[in-house]
């Protein structure tokens, strides 16, 4: 059994006093009588109460766990079940709304049954039966089972010692399971089965000519008792391979597929003729993702003085929408279904306008005023107008589809060295022209803008920066291929070099180590303007590069 309670509250109050001041209005020097008048007529002559701040967090957690293990002969069985109850209030200073002042409650039971025979064959069943306050009726609780199996081929009798000296481990594994998610729509997305009505948000018109408006009640969210758990169905097939004695070289590869259903999102295709004041949401999305991940580890001691360990990992993952309640676009390229979740759409930029004659004979661009030296976009659908209907999917997703890392640690006698590289690939980002545009908010011009921008004396229609202006040119800050960049990079994330000083008896010191370390030392990327991990704003705070020199003493 395990139970915990944690509470923290903060309340502040202030009292104020404003004295009353009087001035002499009349005074009789013979009788000594006088009259006064109030110089501060709006002052309250007693202590006033001024509301202060209020905040508080409370969490109560209870857990009951039962474990049972039994081994007889070549059979091993393990059982485990856990029940939890979690209640928490996290106001975050939002004391005026029930979504922050009412406790959040979750109740659940999970368990696992595992069996193995002779350390060769393995089977496992696990489940989660979870309840959430966000849903109602038969949707409040969800049951999410999973199954798994494994076979260590290298433990079979036919895997002789000669083969085991070369391949010390060969294991195959497969899993299938479902996972539920109720963390949808944030804190104010609680109680989907209740409507949220606010006062003073509406404008109701009265009179024969509707000349008068009055505030009143309006819907901020509509009740939807059909909202339920997002469910993810996961498939995994993997292999583990150990080579040489004690698995000196170990390779793990896992292939996975994930199908997410009932994704909570806006119903964009809901008819406007329904007359709703707010957007409608529901469990209407479906996304599939697949890929593989691999890791490679190596460790070896060559002798007492020389040792080496190395590690590398690689992940490749793609996804796409299978279902999404989106607008009924006429053109297929505007639809999200079939595209990655983090895919972006933009305009195809041809070049910069040469002159006014070209502008007059080109499709009209609906992004504000533009002139020679501004970006010219392609009219994709050929209707004579460039607008949101001409956006096309471009580039890679904004989340990398490939992530990898590799590093090494080694030592020779008293010296040691370690480093680790980190990188990603198949990722795109857009330069944010509104964030780096010169002359706006007293902003200086980045070097690339000063060196390569369109001007009357430098009318390059392929210059990096379009026509300069002291204001933001709306036409030129549209998300387009003009600003699209490939964001792949590899970075030396950490580096450490050390030297261990042997035992010093006079100082009663067992050993000491002096070291130098660095973080984010350099990166390699096709994008050269700034660190690609910063994204589109090259004037933002850069990635920190750190250097450390240290001394470790052990007595």
Q: Where are the model-predicted features located?
A:
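Conserved small-residue
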Residues: 282, 299-398, 456-458
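Extracytoplasmic gating/loop element in the C-terminal half of outer-membrane beta-barrel translocons
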Residues: 31, 424-514, 518
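C-terminal beta-signal and terminal closure region of outer-membrane beta-barrel proteins
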Residues: 281-289, 332-359, 453, 458-464, ...
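Solvent-exposed loop/turn elements at secondary-structure boundaries
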Residues: 92, 160-231, 235, 248-250, ...
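Outer-membrane beta-barrel signature, preferentially recognizing the C-terminal barrel domain
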Residues: 102, 153, 199-250, 279-303, ...
């Amino acid at each position: 059994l395990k139970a915990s309670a944690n509470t923290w509250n903060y309340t502040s109050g202030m009292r104020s006093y404003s004295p009353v001041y009087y001035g002499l209005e009349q005074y009789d020097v013979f009788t000594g009588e006088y009259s006064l008048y109030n110089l501060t007529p709006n002052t309250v002559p007693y202590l006033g109460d001024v509301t202060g701040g209020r905040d508080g967090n409370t969490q109560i957690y209870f857990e009951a766990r039962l474990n049972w293990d039994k081994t007889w002969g070549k059979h091993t069985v393990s059982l485990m079940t856990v029940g939890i109850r979690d209640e928490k209030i996290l106001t975050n200073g939002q004391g005026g709304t029930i979504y922050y002042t009412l406790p959040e409650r979750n109740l659940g039971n999970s368990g696992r049954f595992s069996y193995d025979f002779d350390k060769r064959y393995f089977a496992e069943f696990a489940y989660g039966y979870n309840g959430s306050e966000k849903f109602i009726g038969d949707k409040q609780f969800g049951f999410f089972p999973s199954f798994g199996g494994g076979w260590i081929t290298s433990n079979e009798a036919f895997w002789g010692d000669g083969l085991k000296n070369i391949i010390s481990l060969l294991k195959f594994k497969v899993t299938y399971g479902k996972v539920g998610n109720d963390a949808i729509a944030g804190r104010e997305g609680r109680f989907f089965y209740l409507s949220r009505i606010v006062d003073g948000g509406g404008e109701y018109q009265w009179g024969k000519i509707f000349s008068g408006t009055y505030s009143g009640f309006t819907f901020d969210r509509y009740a939807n008792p059909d909202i339920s758990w997002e469910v993810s169905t996961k498939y995994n097939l993997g292999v583990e391979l150990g080579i040489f004695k004690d698995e000196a070289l170990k390779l793990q590869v896992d292939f996975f597929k994930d199908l997410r259903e009932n994704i909570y999102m806006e119903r964009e295709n809901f008819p406007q003729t329904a007359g709703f004041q707010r957007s409608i949401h529901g469990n209407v999305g479906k996304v599939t993702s697949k890929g593989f991940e691999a890791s490679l580890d190596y460790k070896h001691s060559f002798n007492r003085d020389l040792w080496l360990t190395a590690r590398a990992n690689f992940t490749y993952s793609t996804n796409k929408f299978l279902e999404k309640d989106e607008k009924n676009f006429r053109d297929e390229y505007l639809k999200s279904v079939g595209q990655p979740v983090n895919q972006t759409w933009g305009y195809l930029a041809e070049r910069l306008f040469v002159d006014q004659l070209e502008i007059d004979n080109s499709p009209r661009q609906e992004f504000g005023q533009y002139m020679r030296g501004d970006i010219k976009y392609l009219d994709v659908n050929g209707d004579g107008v460039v607008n949101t209907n001409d956006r096309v999917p471009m580039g890679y997703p904004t989340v990398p589809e490939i992530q990898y890392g590799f590093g090494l640690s080694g030592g020779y006698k008293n010296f040691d060295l370690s480093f680790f590289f980190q990188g990603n690939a198949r990722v795109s980002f857009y330069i944010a022209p509104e964030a780096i545009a010169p002359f706006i908010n007293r902003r200086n011009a980045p070097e690339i803008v000063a060196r390569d921008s369109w001007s009357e004396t430098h009318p390059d229609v392929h210059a990096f920066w379009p026509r300069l202006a002291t204001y933001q040119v709306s036409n030129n800050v549209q998300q387009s291929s003009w600003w699209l960049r490939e964001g792949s990079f590899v970075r030396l994330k950490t580096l450490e070099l050390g030297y261990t000083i042997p035992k010093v008896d006079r100082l009663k010191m067992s050993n000491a180590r002096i070291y130098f370390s660095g973080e984010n030392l350099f990166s390699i990327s096709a994008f050269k303007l700034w660190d690609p991990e910063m994204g589109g704003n090259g004037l933002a705070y850069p990635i920190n590069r750190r250097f450390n020199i240290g001394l470790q003493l052990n007595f």
